[in-house]
């Protein structure tokens, strides 16, 4: 089956045929480089996707730690894709559409992707301190070391990321799944909002969109769950739970 990726048309090639530069909403170059990786390159980077390099797993696939040929440490998400049902395909496209042109210190950086037959991979910066869920909701030892200064900095960082997504970038982005496991932490415990597989784009002037309810129970806003009307406030509610 031949698949079409409209979102990949938002990139233009450079002299290196493995590197593309994203375009902004006005057709100009945003300056953010987005790389198209080969499956072989990613397989080598994480030692054949060995279990020792697996750092996480969820309903959409597994995440592996890897090292690129230039020494860059990355996290490689290998999506579970079923082409007939499009399972995983929508999440893949949503992630690229949301992050390919977004640049903020509190958003996870998307280096690029891999599209080969049924293979769909996304390549991000590697986060040394895992996630907020791991650090704060995991072992008691981790939780005890997570002092109030770290907690405040994490909350401020996530708030800044949401302000950027909701107001500063165009089209605006509603994440739809803000939760502790989707807030990653770098080596200095700086927060990076991640996992945009459920994200929706809002054009300028759009106050809400009607869509199926998706997200995580406990973090979903009651208004969205009942009405299926998604707004920026849905993310704000999830942030309040966080």
Swiss-Prot record:
Keyword Cell membrane in record: no
EC number in record: 2.7.11.1
Signal peptide from the UniProt entry: none
Active-site residue list: 177
Catalysed reaction equations from the record: L-seryl-[protein] + ATP = O-phospho-L-seryl-[protein] + ADP + H(+); L-threonyl-[protein] + ATP = O-phospho-L-threonyl-[protein] + ADP + H(+)
EC top class named in words: transferase
Keywords, in A-Z order: ATP-binding, Kinase, Nucleotide-binding, Serine/threonine-protein kinase, Transferase
Binding-site positions, ATP: 55-63, 77
GO molecular function ontology, one term from the record: protein serine/threonine kinase activity
Induction: Neither up- or down-regulated in response to zinc ion contamination and in response or to mixed metal ion contamination (cadmium, copper, lead and zinc).
The Protein kinase domain, residue ranges: 49-242
Family, similarity comment: Belongs to the protein kinase superfamily. Ser/Thr protein kinase family.
Protein name from the UniProt record: Putative serine/threonine-protein kinase
